Amino acid sequence: MRRGIAAAVLATAIAVSASACGSSGSSASGSAASAGPVTITWWDTSDATNEAPTYKALVAQFERANPNIKVNYVSVPFADAQTKFTTAAAAGKGAPDVLRSDVGWVAGFAQQGYLVPLDGTPAAAEKASFEQQLITQATYQGKLYGIPEVTDTLALMYNKAIFAKAGITAAPTTWDQLKADAAQIKQKAGVDGFDFNPNSYYAMPFLYGEGTDMIDVANKKLEFNSAAAIKGINTLKDLISAPGVAKLDTTANGYANIMDAFESGKVASIIQGPWETTNVFKGSSFTDKSNLGIAAVPAGSAGKAGAPIGGHNLVAYAGSDAAHQAASEKLIAFLTSAASQTTIATKNATLPTRQDAYTSAVTANPGIAGFQAVLSAGMPRPANAQYSSLYGPFGTELTKILTGQESVQAGMSNVTVQSQKLLPDYAAQ
């Protein structure tokens, strides 16, 4: 939906004095509406079993501190949330006041007029305390539409004991070093040195390593066909066919198979995110947590390592009335405070988005401490509403490239053609 249509829906909703929030029916007019008790709805997309209990406890704490605000907490499956929110916001009915949004959704929601800017509100009062690349990622056309709640990135996870057995004392810092280490590990330790998940998100470090991305926003260009992108994917293709690198697994269970192999010591290193550290520590090779090494992804020929930044932002719905927006801003500020983020990190083993939340209690978790050290290599996503949609065509062609069904040049050309349908105003290289 275009911004103008969204605005029309919002105007209609206000005209009939009905809150667009599904949890309440308060009008935006009148002092009583702003002074009296208000109930806001929060859609939480965290894991309902392992993470939601922490958020429910924080909501209860918030309500005790703010007796005039009640929070209708709703756990919404992450896989359904983007479509569900879009449908409700487009209809002007049933959308929550606050949403835990994937960082990749924010630009699209903002472009469609579904979110309210948070600049100058209580939600953004401590903006300077957050990792600035995360603030950049939550900004669209110069306005801040989300407050970073949790973050993540990719890193090289490696088995220190296997590396030591092969006579390797440090993690590789370039793809060429990783290739050489994999061969040495296979020869001296008898297991594969590296395994790769053939997913476009996991291929991004190979683009960043050549100083490029999927798009160039400033010049409105698609980068898939650029010399740098071609070089990056050629580097990846050469790596996965090198001695000591596990055979590419493109089956439906491929992701799980890679993790099982790493956790059991059958593979020495993988590219992975912090969401898997809890599972890794349950593996037979990591009963001693200090055996897990976490390093920045290797660098490409540009000499710089780079990995995509993921995570979630808290956003506020533009269709909520003034009283509900004010209450939403308070909730967002509370949930993203240093104290709340410390609680979330210690309970859920997720990465905080602000440095003052990395307390000694938080960094006592070696997974969090390890990923904190590599966050500086994180690359914020460009502020383009269609950016996340590009992972689809990129992933489809990447599988064909890596399995030898098409050349790197042909595959990246195909990605370009498909991407131009999503970004018709972007030129190809």
Label each region the model flagged.
Residues A95-D97, E126-I162, D192-F196, I294, ...:
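A structural signal for short loop-to-beta-strand junctions that line the ligand-binding cleft
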Residues A182-A183, K221-T250:
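Glycine-centered hinge/linker elements that transmit conformational signals in sensory
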Residues R2-A107, A299-A302, A323-A326, A410, ...:
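Conserved N-terminal structural module of periplasmic/extracytoplasmic solute-binding proteins
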Residues V103-T153, Q177-K179, Q187, F206, ...:
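Hinge/lid segment of periplasmic solute-binding proteins
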Residues D119-F130, T212-I233, K282-T287, A296-G306, ...:
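Short, solvent-exposed loop/beta-turn-alpha elements that line the ligand-binding surface or hinge
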